[in-house]
């Protein structure tokens, strides 16, 4: 086992504070509309330019083990805030740095670290309650756009695009952000349910120019096993032909005689038909077939339920206004499912999302939820260079997460004003002077984000903070973009309460642990063994001299 290096009390805390400061100073320059960029060297490819706090934090690794421990603890603050709220990582880092710095001074002055932490926790729960109480619910699309614009660093086009996407797919809908192949940023909305399976044979195509199969007012047969025997399918095919409506078959696979017969009938014009494989695998496939059944008002034909294909009538088939099938995707628009059944299924999936612990399962369940609840929107981020696209994609991701958080819990005035105001309404009372000192530490820390935003904009931080606190208006603040004071909500500068709350809670949690640290243990640096370095003695200067006259 390697030898360990142990540091105690003041020495340990000072090293750790140095690490906290290095990381926080690199992250906090990105805060606010006038925040600066950070350039990150990559081992391959072009350097990355970003204004995303958590991306900067994740890149920092310090040489000194003790300083690195401090930096990594604060990095954890940014990551945690990012995981829960998706934005506010820089605010969380600034708050954590302030609490650690003030806490370090208090401990050095002889205060009890445990009581300081209790005071910090009391103040934080008080502030969180105030924030939630003062939050305003989002009602209009304009408010959604405002949140997106602020989180996207003042880029109005980003805010508008996110608001438009949310309007089209609903708050539950899936909105994904991808890199575009062009210079333009665009929004594409897929309404209805789309899954990534295309037609089984190109002969099913109805539009040869676009190579898609479009079925209007179609019946949908959902079968969970393979279809290879034509005989079993005949009754249902004959019933559909009588109605002269098209038919879409979704099953594990259609092969052999069954597929050949369907293709021949399609080509002869007797039957408008298309077949696709069912989406997903295993249990997920069953669940997705059930989703499609509920959406279209049909039934999954399954041996487990004792339903044989021979006995299937038209009433067991789903219906949809339009089905569009390309080589890779199938989209079902306007299914005939009952609204209450779809809502019941949505509630069931939401319950599963809350219960699952796996991120992968959660993501897949959310995709299913979106397909049932309204559709999928894709924002394709474009730019002139790859570096620009990556930087903009970071901002769009942040803006999207912030907007979701705002819809969920409401909004408060932005620009650090909500925290600054909350510092005035902390009513918590400490049980002793050390706890009261902990409460004061939080009160001072709550000014840090507003001060940093002002400093990044080139304003005098203490004057800005003083001016905001002097004014009694709850939404009065400093617009760093224009350098004006005024009503933050009227100016459209708002923050999601979830982002502000999470940033403070995570910052205080980790900062409290750092303040109460008394010893630190790290692996001791290995001493170089004597005489190990350098070349063996006799190989000095011209050891290879005799090769001069060789002819090549």
UniProtKB/Swiss-Prot annotation:
Its EC number is 5.6.1.7. This is Chaperonin GroEL 3. Pfam families: Cpn60_TCP1. GO terms for molecular function: ATP binding; ATP-dependent protein folding chaperone; isomerase activity; unfolded protein binding. Keywords: ATP-binding, Chaperone, Cytoplasm, Isomerase, Nucleotide-binding. It is an enzyme of class 5 (isomerase). It comes from the Bacteria. Belongs to the chaperonin (HSP60) family. Forms a cylinder of 14 subunits composed of two heptameric rings stacked back-to-back. Interacts with the co-chaperonin GroES. GO terms for biological process: protein refolding. Together with its co-chaperonin GroES, plays an essential role in assisting protein folding. The GroEL-GroES system forms a nano-cage that allows encapsulation of the non-native substrate proteins and provides a physical environment optimized to promote and accelerate protein folding. It is found in: Cytoplasm. It catalyses: ATP + H2O + a folded polypeptide = ADP + phosphate + an unfolded polypeptide. It comes from Mesorhizobium japonicum (strain LMG 29417 / CECT 9101 / MAFF 303099). GO terms for cellular component: cytoplasm. ATP binds at residues 30-33, 51, 87-91, 415, 495. The keyword Transport does not apply. Disulfide bonds: none annotated. Its main location: cytoplasm. The gene is groEL3. The keyword Hydrolase does not apply.
């Amino acid at each position: 086992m390697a030898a360990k290096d142990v540091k105690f009390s003041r020495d340990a805390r000072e090293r750790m504070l140095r690490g906290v400061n290095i990381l926080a100073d690199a992250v906090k320059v990105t805060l606010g509309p006038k925040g600066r960029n950070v350039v990150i060297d990559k081992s391959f490819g072009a350097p990355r330019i970003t204004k995303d706090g958590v991306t900067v934090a994740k890149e920092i690794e310090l040489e000194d083990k003790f300083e690195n421990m401090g930096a990594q603890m604060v990095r954890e603050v940014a990551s945690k805030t990012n995981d829960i709220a998706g934005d506010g990582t820089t605010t969380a880092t600034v708050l954590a740095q302030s609490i650690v710095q003030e806490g370090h001074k208090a401990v050095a002055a002889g205060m009890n670290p445990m009581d300081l932490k209790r005071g910090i926790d009391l103040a934080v729960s008080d502030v969180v309650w105030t924030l939630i109480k003062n939050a305003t619910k989002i009602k209009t699309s304009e408010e959604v756009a405002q949140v997106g614009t602020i989180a996207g660093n003042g880029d109005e086009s980003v805010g508008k695009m996110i608001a438009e996407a949310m309007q089209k797919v609903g708050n539950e809908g899936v909105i994904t952000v991808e890199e575009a192949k062009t210079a333009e940023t665009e929004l594409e909305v897929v309404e209805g349910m789309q899954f990534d399976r295309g037609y089984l044979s190109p002969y099913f195509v109805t539009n040869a120019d676009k190579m898609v199969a479009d079925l209007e007012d179609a019946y949908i047969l959902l079968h969970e096993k393979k279809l290879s025997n034509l005989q079993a399918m005949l009754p249902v095919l004959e019933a559909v032909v009588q109605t002269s409506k098209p038919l879409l078959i979704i099953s594990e696979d259609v092969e052999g005689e069954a597929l050949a017969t369907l293709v021949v009938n399609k080509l002869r014009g007797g039957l408008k038909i298309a077949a696709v494989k069912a989406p997903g695998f295993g249990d997920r496939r069953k669940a997705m077939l059930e989703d499609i059944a509920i959406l279209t008002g049909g039934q999954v034909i399954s041996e487990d339920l004792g339903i044989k294909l021979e006995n299937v009538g038209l009433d067991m088939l789903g219906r949809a206004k339009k089905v569009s099938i390309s080589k890779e995707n199938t989209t079902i628009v306007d299914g005939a499912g009952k609204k209450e059944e779809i809502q019941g299924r949505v509630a069931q999936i939401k319950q599963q999302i809350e219960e699952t612990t796996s991120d992968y399962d959660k993501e897949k369940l959310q995709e299913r939820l979106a397909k049932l609840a309204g559709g999928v929107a894709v924002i394709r981020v474009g730019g002139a260079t790859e570096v620009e696209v990556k930087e903009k994609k970071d901002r769009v991701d942040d803006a999207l997460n912030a907007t979701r958080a705002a819809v969920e819990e409401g909004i408060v005035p932005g620009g650090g004003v909500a925290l600054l105001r909350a510092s005035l309404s902390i009513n918590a009372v400490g049980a002793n002077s050390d706890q009261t000192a902990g409460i004061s530490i939080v009160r001072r820390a709550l000014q840090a984000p507003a001060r940093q935003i002002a400093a990044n904009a080139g304003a005098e931080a203490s004057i800005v903070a003083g001016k905001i606190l002097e004014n009694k208006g709850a939404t009065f603040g400093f617009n760093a973009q224009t350098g004006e004071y005024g009503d933050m909500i009227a100016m459209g500068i708002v923050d999601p309460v979830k982002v502000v709350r999470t940033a403070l809670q995570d910052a205080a949690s980790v900062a409290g642990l750092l303040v109460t640290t008394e010893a630190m243990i790290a692996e001791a640096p290995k001493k170089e063994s004597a005489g190990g370095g350098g070349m063996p003695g006799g190989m000095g200067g011209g050891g290879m001299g005799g090769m001069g006259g060789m002819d090549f």
